[in-house]
Regions:
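Short, Lys/Arg-enriched segments at the junction into DNA-binding effector domains
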Residues: 3, 115-150
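Active-site residues of response regulator receiver
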Residues: 52, 80
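Acidic catalytic/metal-coordinating carboxylates
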Residues: 33, 59-62
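Short hydrophobic/Thr-rich beta-strand motif most characteristic of the beta2 strand and flanking loop
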Residues: 25-32, 40
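Charged docking surfaces used in two-component/phosphorelay signaling
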Residues: 15-23
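Receiver (REC) domain active-site loop signature in two-component systems and cognate sites
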Residues: 55
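Short amphipathic alpha-helix used as the core "switch/output" element in two-component signaling
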Residues: 39, 61-72
Length: 150
């Protein structure tokens, strides 16, 4: 079961997202700001983050920047009331993978979550195949041309 972290300061909206995602077979955990989201990421594994932009303490832009600077490639769907093109551009430049404007059609949100998770899973599978192939090449090379440190 995929686990989704929801960073949204509006409690009712956060609970709605949790309910809809749970009803669609996901495990959903909610936090109220970016700082809590980073703390949750430190203590548990998540497959995807849904984040508002305008939150207290640490906004969605900074949350995503912090994750990307730390090398975390978790898919991020930003959901916000900010509908200007510059806000959307900043969301993507910050590192988000998708962007929706409130009010949100929850059925569309579930479809986007599913698509983001599918792409992330495919990318992970490719990395595993490539990593396995590289490891196999090194093992073959070591067997055919042993190297000594002497």
């Amino acid at each position: 079961m995929f686990k989704i972290l929801i960073a949204e300061d509006d409690r009712e909206l956060r609970q709605l997202f949790q309910h809809v995602l749970t009803k669609n077979g996901y495990a959903a955990v909610g936090v109220s700001n970016g700082e809590e989201a980073l703390a949750a990421m430190d203590t548990s594994y998540y497959d995807l983050i849904i984040s508002d932009i305008m939150m207290p303490k640490l906004d969605g832009y900074e949350l995503v920047r912090s994750l990307r600077e730390a090398g975390n490639s978790i898919p991020v769907l930003m959901i916000t009331a900010k509908d200007a093109f510059d806000d959307m551009r900043l969301g993507f430049v910050s590192g988000s993978d998708d962007y929706m404007v409130k009010p949100v059609n929850v059925n569309e949100m579930v479809l986007r979550v599913s698509a983001l998770l599918r792409r992330a899973q495919m990318a992970n599978e490719r990395r595993q195949v490539i990593g396995g192939t590289v490891l196999e090449c090194f093992r073959n090379l070591e067997q055919t041309a042993p190297v000594s440190a002497e």
